[in-house]
UniProtKB/Swiss-Prot annotation:
Subcellular localization, as worded in the UniProt entry: Membrane
Protein name: Cytochrome P450 71B35
Source organism: Arabidopsis thaliana (Mouse-ear cress)
Keyword terms: Heme, Iron, Membrane, Metal-binding, Monooxygenase, Oxidoreductase, Transmembrane, Transmembrane helix
The gene coding this protein: CYP71B35
An annotated Gene Ontology molecular function: heme binding
Pfam families cross-referenced by the UniProt entry: p450
GO cellular component term, pick one: membrane
PANTHER family according to UniProt: CYTOCHROME P450 71A9-LIKE ISOFORM X1, CYTOCHROME P450 FAMILY 71 PROTEIN
Family: Belongs to the cytochrome P450 family.
Residues reported to bind heme: C439
Recorded topology in the membrane: Single-pass membrane protein
Length: 500
């Protein structure tokens, strides 16, 4: 009978908390804000694909929208103008990251680039990566690896073409990026090694899921961690960290034993800097720093390029006119050469438009990683208090009718008469983010996508499987920190006769 008082007591506590919050934060009333519940706020409205849910809410509440996610005040911006205010005008006010359970666990307490707070350490590690890992010189130096791995992909697809078998392009694009990244970062080929096992793919998938998963501890203070333990999320995070740690140690052992192949790779470079006692911020470079940096290289490098290539091929299959036009450009430029070179990419203007249009409709990270306000500032007359989390919904910006004519139509020609690029200075198109937290590997990622797509489109014509029509190709999204195509993209390759 004692439990009969429990529900009324909980209800009373919720009411008191709601009243307390209302009085404590009167300035939040000025924000357009969907109604929420005590304790959980608007968490129940987020859904499996938050960028889509927030886009729908922004249609009603505007491009600057306030939410309470649990006990965390959150502002979502959904237009190019408000994104410009966050990423350029007020960048220095909000370029740090909030403390989040998944990133803290997997990044060795924020020793990486993506999730590290804005401080001297972050500045130094970013500078190191820009100069040593992602520089133009480094991108050019790994081109022979790309050439070899693309050749393997083409040969594999050619075998399917000879038998008229459909190809799973989700898998092919992922295999290519995994192979290139693993050889570049670890000096180890994907094919015929431990990296070729399901185990490796599961490690990568699980780590990405843990970085992007909802953690109650991040939104509900004091008791949220209990929910994470009871749901098993905390246990999964700990296992994911152990698996990643074991993988990195295995890579270090291969380098110590001299069993890796090729020239100096990322691990070689970082181990050399560790030996030289390089300083990052106030700390010397340690093995944990190296693991955290490699985590960013591994997860971001593999996933984002593969996802963009998959979405591009999806949209081309849905739009035969565009497919024909981009193939014509590539084949006219290449003639009958057997292989495309890196230097050829500069001449493929329409291909670049296709990729931009893919980024517009299918940004790999539809919600940029969250920022946190370090000092108070205003957007469109609304005050953003300290400790407010900020999300830039680039998926919504790509569908904003005030910015794009016919935003749901895949039309690469929209980039023909403007200078919009993806380097973070044009806030209509932000696949790599913007401001101080822009992705440092833009050039490496862009060249990987361009080179992979150009070869797929040069060497093969792509047909739909028997019984499948263009209208049957879906664009459903899989949930996650990065958003891939939910269902497989199966297309039948036909070898181009003049280069076969």
């Amino acid at each position: 009978m004692a439990h009969i008082w429990l529900l009324p007591l909980i209800f009373l506590v919720c009411i008191l908390l709601a009243v307390f919050n209302h009085k404590k934060h009167p300035k939040y009333r000025q924000f357009p804000c969907p109604p929420g519940f005590p304790i959980i706020g608007n968490l129940h409205q987020i859904g499996e694909l938050p960028h889509q849910t927030l886009w729908k809410l922004s249609k009603k509440y505007g491009p600057v929208m306030h939410l309470m996610l649990g006990r965390v005040p959150t502002v979502v911006v959904s237009s190019s103008d408000t994104a410009r205010q966050v990423l350029r005008v007020h960048d220095l006010h909000c370029c740090t990251r909030p403390s989040l359970s998944g990133p803290r666990e997997l990044s060795y307490n924020y020793l990486d680039i993506a999730f590290s707070p804005y401080d001297d350490y972050w500045k130094e590690v970013r500078k190191l990566c820009v100069q040593e890992l992602f520089s133009t010189k480094q991108v050019h130096s790994i081109q022979p690896i790309k050439d070899e791995e693309v050749k393997k992909m083409i040969d594999s697809i050619a075998e399917s073409a000879s038998q008229k078998n459909p190809v799973n392009l989700n898998n092919k694009c992922l295999e290519l990026t995994v192979s290139v990244v693993c050889r570049t970062a670890f000096g180890v080929s994907f094919e015929g090694t431990v990296l070729n096992s399901d185990r490796f793919n599961k490690i990568v998938r699980e780590a990405l899921e843990m970085l992007g998963s909802f953690s109650a501890a991040d939104f509900i203070p004091y008791v949220g961690w209990i929910i994470d333990v009871l749901t098993g999320l905390q246990g999964r995070r700990e296992r994911s960290k152990r698996d990643l740690n074991a993988f990195f140690e295995q890579m270090f052992d291969l380098h110590k034993e001299g069993k890796k192949e090729g020239n100096e790779d990322f691990v070689d470079l970082l181990l050399r800097l560790e030996k030289e006692e390089a300083v990052l911020g106030n700390d010397k470079l340690t093995r944990n720093h190296i693991k955290a940096i490699l985590l960013d290289v591994l997860l971001a490098g593999i996933d984002t390029s593969a996802i963009t290539m998959t979405w591009a091929m999806t949209e081309l299959a849905r739009n035969p006119r565009v497919m024909k036009k981009v193939q014509s450009e590539i084949r006219t430029q290449m003639g009958n050469r057997s292989m495309i070179s890196f230097e050829d990419m500069d001449q493929l203007e329409y291909l670049k438009m296709v990729i931009k249009e893919t980024w517009r409709l299918h940004p790999t990270t539809p919600l940029l990683l969250p920022r946190e306000a370090m000092s108070e500032f205003d957007i469109n007359g609304y005050t953003i208090p300290v400790k407010t989390r900020l999300h830039v919904n680039v998926w919504a910006i790509g569908r904003d009718p005030d910015t794009w004519k016919d935003p749901e139509v895949f039309l690469p020609e929209r980039f023909m008469d403007n200078n919009i690029d993806a380097k973070g200075q044009h806030f209509e198109l932000l696949p790599f983010g913007g401001g101080r937290r822009i992705c440092p590997a833009i050039y490496m990622g862009t060249t990987m996508v361009e080179f992979g797509l150009a070869n797929l489109l040069y060497h093969f014509d792509w047909k739909l499987p028997e019984g499948v029509e263009v209208k049957d190709i879906d664009v459903e999204e899989a949930p996650g920190l990065t958003v891939n195509k939910k269902n497989e993209l199966l297309l039948v390759p036909e070898m181009r006769r003049s280069c076969g």
